[in-house]
Amino acid sequence: MATVTTHASASIFRPCTSKPRFLTGSSGRLNRDLSFTSIGSSAKTSSFKVEAKKGEWLPGLASPDYLTGSLAGDNGFDPLGLAEDPENLKWFVQAELVNGRWAMLGVAGMLLPEVFTKIGIINVPEWYDAGKEQYFASSSTLFVIEFILFHYVEIRRWQDIKNPGSVNQDPIFKQYSLPKGEVGYPGGIFNPLNFAPTQEAKEKELANGRLAMLAFLGFVVQHNVTGKGPFENLLQHLSDPWHNTIVQTFN
């Protein structure tokens, strides 16, 4: 008969004394020692160590050489080799950052109005009917205006990626300018609470942005399948959790 004893470092049981590696950006490691002790005159102990290193999205799978783990959110995941070109990598880093921010705003804009309408605070259409509303201009006119404005913004953002700091000065109102900073984190008026772009904050923002992009895709697919919004689907599921599920929906 044998007993299995698990020995863990004290830091595991004191989460307040240390932060996870993916939050701190350090090359932290997770150590677990397992000891197997046989009851008898002679006890034998064996142990092994498991290490989770920065830049390994799957432990044991080597990351590409061009992904060193120095970037926020870099876990070595690039199966198609899209970031092998350094110039492409610069663009992908900023593209993911901006799309994640838009996704977080979009998901909040899809979910919160539906929730507030359901509880009677406001009365607005669902996100999928918002385009049917009558605005101060036609939808085609608004599309053209939006296209021109976003084209201007994206051109300047690309210039900032190619030559950091080159667009900090307002081209029209010369008295306004942004402080020098890292690309993608302009500061100034875009950072009213004066949050510092620490490695921990960058990791959290990217994690939430990636989750929001998946949530946005899920909301769109969910509506195409059920014809309802995310909050309505949640309420329907909670009313009968064993029968109102994705299984019954596809059946």
Curated annotation (Swiss-Prot):
Residues the record lists as binding chlorophyll a 4: 208
Binding site for chlorophyll b 4: 157
Residues binding chlorophyll a 6: 237
Residues that, per the record, bind chlorophyll a 3: 205
Membrane-protein topology: Multi-pass membrane protein
Binding site for chlorophyll a 5: 204, 222
Residues the record lists as Phosphoserine modifications: 35
Sequence positions that bind chlorophyll b 3: 138, 154
Binding site for chlorophyll b 2: 101, 144
GO biological process: photosynthesis, light harvesting in photosystem I; response to cold; response to high light intensity; response to low light intensity stimulus
Gene3D superfamilies (alphabetical): Chlorophyll a/b binding protein domain
Family per record: Belongs to the light-harvesting chlorophyll a/b-binding (LHC) protein family.
Protein's UniProt name: Chlorophyll a-b binding protein 4, chloroplastic
The species this protein was found in: Arabidopsis thaliana
Biological classification of the source: Eukaryota, Viridiplantae, Streptophyta, Embryophyta, Tracheophyta
Gene expressing this chain: LHCA4
